[in-house]
Amino acid sequence: MTLPAPRDGSPAVPRLADIAAQAQVSEATASRVLNGRPASRXSTRQRVLAALDLLGYERPTRLRRRSAGLIGLVTPELTNPIFPAFAQVVEQALAGYGYTPVLCTQIPGGATEDELVEQLEERGVNGIVFLSGLHADTTADPRRYARLTERGVPFVLINGYNERIRAPFVSPDDRSAVRMAVRHLADLGHRRIGLAVGPDRYVPSRRKAEGFADALAEILGTPRDQAEQHVRRTLFSVEGGHAAAGSLLEQGCTGLVCGSDLMALGAVRAARERGLDVPADLSVVGFDDSQLVAFTDPPLTTVRQPVHAMATAAVGALLEEIAHQTVQRTEFVFQPELVVRGSTAQWVPGG
């Protein structure tokens, strides 16, 4: 059989064994798919074709199919690495079902979410995936989404459940994420723990703050009405984390939980500017498990969002809507995971 050529035009040709290993199938099965002969299941065929894509090789002409349609993906600006991570999985999942993703990124001074949606509708998209959009802002008018439904445009929303919007939502358990971070710091001996999080009008920020108050009460016995003293609300950015950490350090906090990995990196910077060592003097926990945080100095302890599971579920719900199948217009909540690295350590008073 003739294996496909690489997309970059280089002469190297992939081994059948590489494709089979990537797809987790036998070489015989991979060969049947590449030669256009039926495989045992459609899902097997999709795995082999996805393996070709991941290895960077063009699909054989006979295996290509016309696009099933266009799906819009509306995201915030991509400076936060968690958003490109979500976008990549969503795009791969859509491509696996034959859809062509149309990425629409919001940038300062650029098109608004409403303007991007209007452009997508003009292009005749089959549906839209919203990632951390206006639906997560409790001060935004939710009627924009009701109007989408009235116009017959299927959509799904990732992060930021809003009970005023009737649509499938996919979210991480923000409260649980913060509780496990606080538990981790408490187990290391920390008793003065602070939270750096985004503005209260955003649902994920609000839920993280609620989880923080619950955790302080359950684990450290801190009255809920006192938890707010240990919360700083700012931007989900390095600069925001830097400012929040500076304030919490002045309060004597030895452990910080941050609402994003970028905020956590800002907290590390704030500690070092004050001559403090991370983690000897200050333990820091991020949120997201963004690409590269395992390689920062120190490697960042963080709470991992289940990006692949969430993005795949969002695509599945959207495709069910497009197919006019019954879809629960509710929130699908996914459990995060604590990833312990080098930015947290045992607290030794006076050490």
From Swiss-Prot:
Keyword check for Zinc: no
Domain (HTH lacI-type): residue spans on this chain: 14-69
One of the record's GO molecular function terms: DNA-binding transcription factor activity
Signal peptide (from-to): none
DNA-binding interval(s): 16-35
Pfam families, A to Z: LacI (PF00356), Peripla_BP_3 (PF13377)
Keyword DNA damage found: no
InterPro entries associated with the record: HTH_LacI (IPR000843), LacI/GalR-like_sensor (IPR046335), Lambda_DNA-bd_dom_sf (IPR010982), Peripla_BP_I (IPR028082)
Keywords: DNA-binding, Transcription, Transcription regulation
PROSITE patterns: HTH_LACI_1, HTH_LACI_2
Gene3D superfamilies: 3.40.50.2300, lambda repressor-like DNA-binding domains (1.10.260.40)
Reported function: Putative sugar-binding regulatory protein for the alpha-amylase gene.
Name of protein: Uncharacterized HTH-type transcriptional regulator in aml 5'region
Species this chain originates from: Streptomyces limosus
